[in-house]
Amino acid sequence: MTDERIHILRDILLELHNGASPESVQERFDATFTGVSAIEISLMEHELMNSDSGVTFEDVMELCDVHANLFKNAVKGVEVEDTEHPGHPVRVFKDENLALRAALIRVRRLLDTYESMEDEEMLAEMRKGLVRQMGLLGQFDIHYQRKEELFFPIMERYGHDSPPKVMWGVDDQIRELYQKALGTVRSLPEASISIVKADFEAFATEFESMIFKEESILLMILLESFTQDDWIQIAEESDAYGYAIIRPSEKWVPERKSFVEKKSVEEASQSETVDGQVQQVIDTPEGQFTITFTPKEKEAVMDRNSQQAFGNGYLSVEQANLILNHLPMEITFVNKDDIFQYYNDNTPADEMIFKRTPSQVGRNVELCHPPKYLEKVKAIMQGLREGKKDKYEMWFKSESRGKFVHVTYAAVHDETGEFQGVLEYVQDIQPYREIDTDYYREIE
């Protein structure tokens, strides 16, 4: 991969940005490239968004469809072992896309049939069927959440931070188009079928385009970058988010290879001297040599069960962890450098109000949220950091879960008053809202 090639790719997108027609750019692209890797696309977007070229995140989002179409017939495939095995995250991801496309086709056919149907009784049944199929199709949001919360953090660790931002922004646009389409479907027969079909096709066009981007660009980046350990982590954390329409037919358990070499009979021997130094005999082609050195002291490993001063008493690390995990709320700590550093484990991952997984730990808090919420996240962090407020409180009702959720973002300061980070705690207060007496002290 050469810098020149990346610059040409960048120039092509800048031409589009400045009004060039896709046809004229296509000709130059075909004349220049015999194939383009997903890594190059990633680097190109990163360069565009972080240069002084004038291209912004929003511009790249607008160009996303255009450049994806340009690359459609020129993306090099990547072969990686095990990806077609049932339960592998890549296989699961592709199987979900197949199931989602099938649901989309069913909705499209129902709409076409509805348009030509005249029997009122049949039309009523078809309306019910449309709502059911749209609900099934709506599970794409689970597919997107797993992508955003499990794939994107690992991509960022490998330096691919621009593609997640762009794709997450487009995901949110698709979600909005779906909600609009669902609303018009539910408004039948009051809404005209032509409006319903137009809203659905607006969603379907972007949705099918995203499937291409996922499988022809996103997965190529992942397959070029991710290790087997990365895929194992994703597979282990996927249950917390669930699956769209279908579940993996089996658990993926890859064959692990050990990279620890067996000790050789001729391996160098060591012996400790009186003064604590170590002598080591090394075999080389020129003969044996003896070297003497002072070994590095091993760091003491903290005992998680040893008691130590803790606030107004004594606790072990293990006890402190148990207490945090038994608090009736979800806790997240973001340190003063805006890094997501900790969350407690008080409920199964699939039952969390705000889902958290180990792969999110260590990320910048801004990358943990959809682009549309970025300004609000920045405002909260800045307000708490600068002392404008000690805390921010929010609440909302979740009808689907039967919960009334209360969220608090509180500034954390040390004894000197220095800002150390933000503590978020989330709890379901619906049980407290249902208390209708002034007194209860029974133990039944």
Describe these PLM feature segments:
Residues 1-141, 145-392, 396, 403-405, ...:
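Small-residue-biased structural context
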